[in-house]
Design a protein with these regions (language model features):
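Acidic, glycine/proline-rich low-complexity segments that act as flexible tails and inter-domain linkers
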Residues: 1-92, 309-313, 425-431
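Well-ordered secondary-structure scaffolds
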Residues: 5, 9, 14, 19-21, ...
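Alpha-helix C-terminal capping segments
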Residues: 51, 98-111, 191-196, 231-232, ...
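Glycine/serine-rich anion-binding loops at beta->alpha junctions
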Residues: 81-104, 108-120
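Short acidic, glycine/serine/threonine-rich loops at helix termini
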Residues: 96, 114, 121-126, 157-158, ...
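Short beta-strand segments
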Residues: 113, 147, 155-158, 203-205, ...
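A glycine-rich helix N-cap at a beta->alpha junction
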Residues: 127-153, 223-229, 233
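Phosphate/diphosphate-binding glycine-rich loops and adjacent basic-rich segments that engage nucleotide
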Residues: 148-197
Length: 431
């Protein structure tokens, strides 16, 4: 039996910089999920949390209350250890696509519950839905069957998983409270803990194209999430990784699937390969699998075999031709020299404006829309050489996409100190 409180007294407590008690948190999450606390009241509480923060105990209890609002998944029937990865998202971040089958090829089970894109960051499900026939929505029984048969599954979270978070996420989006670290951490971790994985690697992006552009804030978020995972009995660590430049050479849906398949075939851009292998090593070690060689599994075709099985098991055709946008245009370099910088946010916004992303939940995306990137920082370019190829089904979108790409690159002489950019791995966080 959950003790009853007044929403107003809980709002006032946080407004006045007090810590909320466990019973207060349990009640307000339960009551809001049931509709007994109004959106206006929860909006006020969320803003008070954003302004005044939460102690670790409060964040942990808030997370537990969201988990307890729904079901908890159980993978005890599997013969393999379970491990998952969560990325906070960015531009060209297609890492989940090659990573899940790679880790499965090395002996772990990967129950990857993914989401859709919003704004400039792409969604894993949107990318995979560009494969003809592929299904994002699976029942728990179907998920288990795919995991048993293939070792990896990538699908949407069911309605029964942390339903409190679904309501809170939608409310945060329209009340300017998205940025609150306690709310970000509890939103991510409530779903991941309820998912039932025994180990979790967090990929927290930072830099211009990331949700947490400030590295100090990204590290703070990573520490909070690692603590939440460990307190819940999930083996958890985080890598803070660079998102100042787009990952790989594509931003879009079908474009990123093609690039992921190149990686699984033993090729692909070096930054995608490096980060995929590093994350696979962390996941396998955390899952207790010794002696695995993910780099070899990419080269020898084992990861590709799992990919093909996984796509087929979810109704997709791994050999089907991927959608191609009807129109394209090329953006060229205005001068010659070294490409010194590329703004990931501007590239992501351009891809969104071309139709690769959405501005509201539920909006359709164009499978073939997006951007191919022909040069990255450190490359030598000549005036008139292609920098980007833009793809869309709606030619009118080119104008606004080109506006987004204005001043997205800097071209000049290579400084003696080299290019100033974030290392791919900014920090590894274990507590």
């Amino acid at each position: 039996m959950i003790e009853a409180f007044s929403a107003a007294e809980i709002i006032a407590a946080k407004r006045d910089h007090h810590s909320l008690t466990d019973p207060q948190i349990d009640w307000v999450i339960d009551a809001y999920t049931r509709g007994a606390v109004a959106d206006e009241q929860m909006s006020a509480l969320l803003m008070a949390i954003l302004l005044n923060g939460m102690e670790n105990r409060e964040i942990s209890r808030w997370t537990d209350a969201m988990i307890n609002s729904g079901e908890r998944m159980n993978w005890s029937a599997l013969s393999r250890p379970t491990v998952d990865k969560h990325s906070t998202g960015g531009v060209g971040d297609k890492i989940t696509l090659p990573l899940a089958p790679l880790v499965a090829a090395c002996g772990a089970a990967v129950p990857q519950l993914s989401g859709r894109g919003l704004g400039h960051t792409g969604g894993t499900l949107d990318k995979l839905e560009s494969i003809p026939g592929w299904r994002a929505s699976l029942s728990n029984e179907e998920m288990l069957k795919v995991l048993q048969d293939c070792g990896a599954v990538i699908c949407a979270a069911g309605a029964g998983l942390a339903p409190a978070d679904k309501k809170l996420y939608a409310l945060r989006d329209v009340t300017a409270t998205v940025e609150a670290i306690p709310l970000i951490a509890s939103s991510i971790m409530s779903k991941k803990i309820a998912e039932g994985t025994s180990a979790l690697v967090l990929d927290v992006k930072t830099g211009a194209g990331a949700f947490m552009s400030d590295p100090a804030k990204a590290k703070e978020l990573a520490h909070v999430m690692v603590g939440l995972g460990k307190r819940a009995g999930v083996k958890t660590l985080a890598l803070v990784t660079a998102m100042d430049v787009p990952l790989g050479l594509t931003a879009g849906n079908a474009l990123e699937v093609r690039e992921s398949v190149e990686v699984l075939a033993g090729g692909g851009p070096s930054d995608i390969v490096e980060l995929t292998v590093l994350l696979a090593q962390e996941m396998l070690e955390l899952a207790g699998i010794k002696g695995a060689d993910p780099a070899a599994a990419l080269k020898n075709g084992k990861a590709m075999d799992v990919w093909r099985q996984m796509i087929s098991a979810q109704g997709g055709d791994p050999d089907a031709k991927l959608p191609v946008a009807r129109e394209n245009t090329v953006v060229t370099a205005q001068s010659s020299g070294t490409l010194l910088s590329m703004d990931a946010m501007k590239v992501g916004m351009a891809a969104w404006r071309l139709g690769a992303g959405r501005s509201r939940q539920g909006e359709a995306v164009q499978a073939g829309a997006g951007i191919e990137i022909h040069a990255k920082p450190g490359d030598t370019v000549t005036a008139g050489a292609p920098l980007y190829t833009l793809h869309t089904d709606t030619p009118a979108a080119f104008t606004r996409a080109l506006e987004s790409l204005e001043d997205s690159v800097t071209i000049g002489e290579m400084p003696a100190s080299g290019i100033d950019r974030l290392p791919l791995i900014v920090e590894r966080i274990v507590d």
